[in-house]
Amino acid sequence: MTTSFADYVAQQDARNTIQLNVRKWTMMLCDALEHNFTEYTVRAHKRSANLADRVEDKAYHEMKIKEAQEKCAVKFTFEEGRKYFKVMFRDSGGSNSVHAFVDRKTGEVYKPASFKAPAKHVRFDLRIIEQREWVLKNCDWAGDYLYMKGWHLKKNFCSLHLSFGFYIGEHV
């Protein structure tokens, strides 16, 4: 089967659109992670302020709540690699860690196996609207949503049978 030049151009335009959308969705993931970290910080300081006995401690926690609401103490960014976008967590001290990998062409999200490589199995596919919305709503800065044994995978994606012989959410 041969493909005409017009078909090739149309397919290339579609691939480029998907790749631009994957970049946009990765930026949205970074924003959602920063928002989650801010909520976590505010919640922790409110809890500590309520438990504090001294006035100085309460004032300190109130100050930290205002700081957290004005500016996030951490930054989630992504670096562009040959095959993946590497979602990076950067704290105020300058330390870096890898939060996730996103395939540049397909939008598949992976948990990191190391600083340089993703884990073998896909966790989410950002091209699928239901999964993308779930990830953006439920992602957390610590990365709990990236574990395969999570209840969310059993609930939403059990019917997805993968080629390596088990369903997402079953024993690994």
Positions of PLM-derived features:
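C-terminal partner/receptor-binding element of secreted or periplasmic proteins
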Residues: R127-L153
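A short, surface-exposed interaction/processing loop segment used at functional sites
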Residues: T106-L136
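Negatively charged, low-complexity tracts enriched in Asp/Glu with abundant Ser/Thr
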Residues: F5-K75
